[in-house]
Amino acid sequence: MAMPRKLKNLNLFNDGNSYLGLVKSLTLPALGRKMEAYRGGGMNGPVKADLGFSDDGIQFEWMTGGLDLISLRQFGAVSANSVALRFSGPYQQDDTNEVSNVEVVVRGRHENIEMGDAQPGEDTEHSMTTTCSYYKLTVDGEEIIEIDLLNFVEKVNGVDMLEKHRTAMGI
């Protein structure tokens, strides 16, 4: 029997700026597929056809303590990949003491910034939702998943899932 790898700490970088001590929490992006049921003649039931990435897109939610001027200055960025965020965290397996370095890199722009409640003498925090056009998950230096929505790239476990599609489209 083995113990699971658990996140022991984390850091976030915003365009190369370390948020060590500033980042309070984050929600790593959910990855989803757009699937549509199909049932044709001779089929005893529906099978879902994969129609690409989910219409929900890639969302990165995160929270900082205090006033975050870097993010506020990035709000309204024109380019769909204006903001670069990098999560880095050690996941430790307590029975073996092994530590895995997990890194998630995203590029996008802030869809929402909530400045939270403001009360004298009380903690303040900002909550950000960054909608992403790029996502890459790396574990111990190995690229597990890379998704580049703007450049039609989707790699999973080293396999370029869209290579044949790009070739067929002449790109």
Language model region names:
Residues 19-25, 98-108, 146-149:
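Short amphipathic beta-strand/extended segments with alternating polar/hydrophobic composition
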Residues 13-15, 29, 63-65, 88-90, ...:
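A structural detector for beta-sheet-dominated domains
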Residues 36-44, 93-132:
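A mid-sequence interfacial segment
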Residues 59-111:
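A contiguous binding-surface segment within folded domains or other stable secondary-structure elements
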Residues 1-69, 109-118, 159-168:
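Solvent-exposed edge beta-strands and adjacent loop segments
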Residues 3-8, 82-86, 131-133:
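A short, compositionally biased
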Residues 52-54, 77-81, 100, 120-124:
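A generic structural micro-feature
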Residues 109-171:
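Mixed-charge, glycine-accented linear interaction segment located at domain edges/termini
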